[in-house]
């Protein structure tokens, strides 16, 4: 491996792009404790390429496509299909992702941004994050370095959140169909689920394509839904970030947002075109899913 380049001066540090807060209704109250002192840019780009500034009121999140069929959970009824996000929802993957992110920036001689990196980089496609940091021609080299390091060691710096294994088993016993939709590369997602012994619970595992043609949550969910047809009347997305909510809303699907992930700051004073339920604990998630 080539040695790291000479480090940039601090005045030229790259700036992370932040995703917009997701829209929520108040079926239950979320934890609105936002991380402070990040020193990161307030200007960000969401999964659909919409640029928003957090210093302004409101957001520019696009509405769901007109053709999107309304397929959501019904009040008082358990879902028939649950689609899970991976990072921050099923597994605590922040340590490995942050470690490989640091490695990628060190490799090209770029300083690592200050602040809570997990809050800003875990969830969306890493190639989008790196390309939005103002790294210029070095962005592609950083992406290659990140992928190599994450494939070699970062993926294993990971753990299953407490209670996830039994929850999945109970959902399957109850006859609920299960799937995964993640912006992580699909082969890596399968590797992680297999490593934790939970791959067999999922009818479909949909992730980002390795050629970069499919990466946004909207596209990954479309890929998953196409494989899950015919779709039942009651289905729900379970995730931890705003792009999970926005991606599901684009397909007319409600979301349960878990409180143990990395997106607490995404859900402050916003509304949604679909229902957003907040589950702070695994027991609350069980209640929301009817098991």
Swiss-Prot record:
Annotated catalysed reactions: L-tyrosyl-[protein] + ATP = O-phospho-L-tyrosyl-[protein] + ADP + H(+)
Cellular-component GO terms for this entry: cytosol
Positions with biased composition (Polar residues): 23-60
SUPFAM superfamilies cross-referenced by the UniProt entry: HAD-like (SSF56784)
Entry superkingdom: Bacteria
UniProt keyword list: ATP-binding, Kinase, Nucleotide-binding, Phosphoprotein, Transferase, Tyrosine-protein kinase, Virulence
Role, per record: Required for growth within macrophages. Catalyzes the phosphorylation of PtpA on the tyrosine residues at positions 128 and 129, thereby increasing PtpA phosphatase activity and promoting pathogenicity. Also phosphorylates the thioredoxin reductase TrxB.
Family that this chain belongs to: Belongs to the HAD-like hydrolase superfamily. CbbY/CbbZ/Gph/YieH family.
Domain remark in the UniProt entry: Composed of two domains: the N-terminal highly flexible intrinsically disordered domain (IDD) and the C-terminal rigid kinase core domain (KCD). IDD is unstructured and highly dynamic, allowing transient interactions with the rigid KCD. This interaction modulates the accessibility of the KCD active site. In closed state, IDD masks the autophosphorylation site, thereby decreasing the activity of PtkA. In open state conformation, IDD is away from the autophosphorylation site, making it accessible for phosphorylation and activation of PtkA.
Protein name according to UniProt: Tyrosine-protein kinase PtkA
Organism (species): Mycobacterium tuberculosis (strain ATCC 25618 / H37Rv)
